[in-house]
Swiss-Prot record:
GO terms for biological process: chiasma assembly; embryo development ending in birth or egg hatching; homologous chromosome segregation; mismatch repair; reciprocal meiotic recombination; resolution of meiotic recombination intermediates. It comes from Caenorhabditis elegans. This is MutS protein homolog him-14. Keywords: ATP-binding, DNA recombination, DNA-binding, Meiosis, Nucleotide-binding, Nucleus. Residues 1-21 are annotated as: Disordered. Belongs to the DNA mismatch repair MutS family. The lineage of its organism: Eukaryota, Metazoa, Ecdysozoa, Nematoda, Chromadorea. GO terms for molecular function: ATP binding; ATP-dependent DNA damage sensor activity; double-stranded DNA binding; mismatched DNA binding. InterPro entries: DNA_mismatch_repair_Msh2, DNA_mismatch_repair_MutS_C, DNA_mismatch_repair_MutS_core, DNA_mismatch_repair_MutS_sf, MutS, MutS_con_dom_sf, P-loop_NTPase. Its main location: nucleus. GO terms for cellular component: nucleus. It is found in: Nucleus. Gene3D superfamilies: 1.10.1420.10, MutS, connector domain (3.30.420.110), P-loop containing nucleotide triphosphate hydrolases (3.40.50.300).
Length: 842
């Protein structure tokens, strides 16, 4: 058995690769906070990092300054991602990508610290990711020509998405050369020729959300962002936790990446919407798909096993391969079930038809035939105890395939019989056949005795037995004879695993031409799980399918997280921003709902761009390329930044990078400084954002900011009412117009322990100041002009909607006539209200 080709090839490979490349290893320099920084920075990344993800960063110099090339690989996932982009000096895009993929090992260039380039990058990454393993390596290893040769050698063209332009991206190719070298030296892993999927990541086909906004907008919880779906227990409600109805790890991974980087491809979004709509209409099919998917194993680790070769050959690795080959066979049966379900349902949505065609590939049957010939999965449906799980792997290869394996099995069975006989004899001799004492088996201890009793602390175990451990209701122990059998059993099991591994390697070699179909299956299963999860959410709540256009219009929208917790008590609010009226200023009381409304706006936009239905009666949104937020006012003491400095840093990024395809939400901008400075800075930033033509919502306590609407028709004023019910609960209802209600802050002050005379004096001063402000003249002509522009857009929007739904004869529809009459009445009433207010002031 040990003279076959696979074994000989492994021996030659071990000898050839035993010579480690010491120069590369010595050139790796571990960077830490002490070597780069005078003081450590805040931890802005997740607390739980993934040590399997490696990212290599190459920064451009000279004429390429500002360009970043990255190569990224998860050693448990059969893909390498390449990307090259232009980034800011704060490395915002790079930090976001590292957070999305939860990379732990980060490798950068060294040798240029004296000029400051690498040091700036190192400081930025160490500050943002203090728990990551940051290392630098000599620039000579960033060889783009070598990276291109390796790409051409390892890439499987059928499943890879690498354009011709990628071959000219020298920074990404240089990073690829170091990545492959690093994986080889630190993980002892090689990739088979023409087996790897290499994907070119684009930064222009996704909506970029700054990773600082992930937690402030309640998209993900930073403390639990890197935990796998099945390990997430009690945690703070986030958009991710509300939408997560996936049943596979890869489905969860696709959902997370989609939420953190929503798509900007309208065709992809609409294809997802069609699939979700179809799945909602077929609830039985959706439930069957989810139940079937829950039985599937993750193909990423199976593919990784098939495309990777290691310089070591251990019993543990052999056992893992046997386990993966069993999972592959089981998953292929699941694929057959999903294929049958989708085919019989006669799906109409393009994305589900495409995935069904992938699953019909004849190469699945070819792989199954290879496995059926040598793999026996008859033990999979038996008992699920530890001994059965070991037997599943020991008997995974069919009988009469390898003589040495069959001989080892005979020895294994003989040892099992002997240890069972010994156990029965010792229990009868020392415990007189007590039924509470039995022979047990575990992976860690092997065979041992278990005494089940409620008096574990006081029960007496004969001195003949060893290794006595007392738990609450059991006592475990062993004997010398059983321990001797365990040692022999461990040796025989190792022989069986190594012998089986040779057969598994032969099957992997035979399956190599069919490996691309496993990539298709992995994508298909994760996509179907992703769509079923979104369909489950959309079906459980009152949602609508959003459309896409130039206006940001939502009718009766609800906060996704609040709606999930208690849909009956959730307050609905409208949202309306257009190209002509693209800036909304929101004023109102404390705790009235301003911040919650801003989060609702951003979350609904994200949900729409991942293809999900959103909690509203009607929604039409633009496609956003970037979403900016400035929320929260915390000092960053470790980085020596005050709350105001942190605010201005975020505002600078917005002013610099926002454009007409951006959504900007600002919560109480410049609150952490004096009133005069705060108003002036807010004015200036608002004027700049207006010129950028971004869709913007600003929540502020500076009532003077609302006067900006007098100078620009692009601004609308909104406010929340201060009135409360008997339980001091705010109404949380957004209304049009500037806030002109009472001095709402004193309602909360009166609930505190501040003396009454202090509160009364403060109220008198505030009333006097308020009266001075209200003496300012209102520009009624501007208000009339704004309401006319706004209603003109509403008329046009309604006409387009009814034309799409009813065709050219939409004007004859009663619904359209009633809607137009209602809009006309609203316009007349608003103009009359302005006229009456003007007459009262004269």
């Amino acid at each position: 058995m040990y003279s076959n080709k696979s074994f000989q090839r492994r021996q030659r490979q071990q000898v050839a690769e035993s010579r480690s490349e010491e120069k590369f290893s010595r050139s790796l320099v571990r960077l830490n906070a002490q070597s780069l920084l005078d003081s450590s920075g805040n931890n802005t990344t997740t607390k739980n990092v993934n040590s399997d993800v490696v990212i290599v960063v190459m920064e451009g110099r000279g004429s390429c300054e500002g360009h970043i090339g990255i190569a990224l690989h998860d050693t448990c996932f059969p893909e390498i991602h390449l990307c090259e982009f232009v980034d800011s000096r704060e490395y915002t895009t790079l930090k976001t990508m590292i957070n999305v993929h939860e990379a732990f090992d980060i490798v950068i260039q060294n040798g240029n610290e004296e000029r400051g380039s690498t040091k700036l990058l190192g400081e930025a990454l160490m500050t943002a990711f203090p728990e990551a393993s940051l290392q630098s390596i000599s620039s000579k290893y960033f060889n783009s020509e070598r990276g291109e040769r390796q790409l051409q050698s390892l890439m499987n063209a059928e499943v890879s998405t690498v354009s011709e332009g990628c071959l000219r991206r020298t920074l990404a190719l240089g990073a690829l050369a170091v990545l492959l070298k690093y994986i080889h030296e630190t993980r002892c892993v090689f990739f088979r020729v023409k087996s790897l999927r290499i994907k070119e990541m684009g930064v222009n086909d996704t909506c970029m959300i700054d990773f600082v906004s992930w937690e402030s907008l309640e998209i993900v919880d930073a403390d639990d962002a890197s935990k796998a779906r099945k390990f997430q227990m009690k945690q703070k409600r986030t958009l991710m936790s509300v939408l997560n109805h996936t049943v596979t790890t890869n489905g969860y991974r696709l959902l997370r990446s989609s939420v953190l980087q929503p798509s900007t491809d309208v065709y992809l979004i609409q294809s997802r919407q069609e699939a979700i709509e179809e799945l909602i209409g077929k609830p039985q099919l959706k439930d069957k798909l989810r139940r079937t998917l829950s039985r599937a194993h993750e193909l990423d680790r199976v593919i990784a096993m098939c495309i990777q070769t290691s310089t070591s050959w251990t019993v543990r690795e052999s056992e893992a391969k046997i386990n993966q080959i069993i999972k592959l066979m089981h998953t292929l049966k699941v694929i057959q079930g999903i294929r049958t379900l989708l085919h019989s349902a006669k799906m109409k949505s393009n994305i589900l038809i495409e995935k069904t065609e992938f699953l019909k590939d004849p190469r699945f049957d070819q792989i199954m035939n290879i496995l059926v010939e040598k793999v026996d999965d008859s033990l999979l449906d038996g008992k699920k105890n530890s001994l059965h799980l070991q037997n599943t792997k020991c008997y995974a290869i069919r009988h009469f395939v390898a003589v040495q394996l069959d001989l080892a099995r005979q020895t294994y069975e003989e040892i099992i019989r002997n240890v069972e006989e010994t156990g029965a004899r010792e229990i009868a001799e020392y415990f007189h056949g007590n039924s509470s004492v039995r022979l047990s088996f575990s992976q860690s201890r092997g065979f041992h005795y278990t005494f089940v009793t409620r008096q574990a602390e006081s029960v007496t175990i004969p001195r003949y037995f060893l290794d006595v451990f007392r738990n609450r209701t059991t006592v475990t122990f062993n004997s010398r004879k059983v321990i001797a059998y365990n040692d022999r059993l461990e040796q025989v099991v190792a022989e069986m695993f190594l012998a089986s591994d040779v057969i598994v390697c032969d099957m992997i070699e035979e399956m190599q031409p069919m490996i691309p179909v496993l990539y298709y299956a992995m994508d298909a299963l994760s996509s179907i799980d992703f769509l079923c999860g979104l369909a489950t959410y959309s079906d459980l709540r009152d949602t609508c399918k959003p459309t896409f256009g130039p206006s940001f219009s939502i009718s009766q929208g609800r906060h996704p997280i609040l709606d999930w917790d208690d849909s009956e008590k959730t307050i609905t609010n409208d949202t309306c921003l257009t190209r002509d009226r693209r800036f909304g200023i929101i004023t109102g009381p404390n705790m009235a709902g301003k911040s919650t409304y801003l989060k609702q706006t951003a979350q609904l936009a994200i949900m729409a761009q991942i293809g999900c239905f959103i909690p509203a009666n009607y929604a039409s949104l633009p496609i956003f390329n970037r979403i900016f937020s400035r929320m929260g006012h915390n000092d960053e003491l470790i980085r020596n930044k005050s709350a105001f400095a942190s605010e201005m840093s975020d505002a600078a990024a917005i002013v610099q990078y926002a454009d007409k395809n951006s959504l900007v939400v600002l919560d109480e901008l410049a609150r952490s400084t004096s009133t005069e400075e705060g108003i002036a800075i807010t004015y200036a930033i608002c004027e700049k954002v207006l010129k950028l033509q971004s869709y913007t919502f600003l929540a502020t306590h500076f009532l003077d900011i609302a006067a900006l609407a007098n100078y620009s028709n692009a601004i609308d004023n909104y406010h929340f009412l201060p009135q409360t019910d008997e339980n001091s609960t705010k109404k949380h209802k957004l209304l049009r117009g500037q806030y002109r209600g009472p001095l709402y802050g004193f309602e909360l002050v009166e609930l505190s322990t501040i003396p009454d005379e202090v509160i009364e004096h403060a109220q008198s001063l505030a009333t006097e100041l308020r009266a001075n402000v209200e003496d300012t003249e209102r520009d009624y002509d501007s208000e009339r002009r704004r309401i006319k522009v706004y209603m003109n857009h509403r008329f046009r929007e309604c006409a387009e909607y009814f034309m799409d739904t009813h065709g050219e004869k939409w004007k004859e529809e009663k619904e359209a006539i009633d809607k137009m009459k209602a809009l006309r009445k609203y316009l007349v009433d608003e103009l009359a209200k302005i006229d009456s207010q003007e007459q009262m002031c004269q």
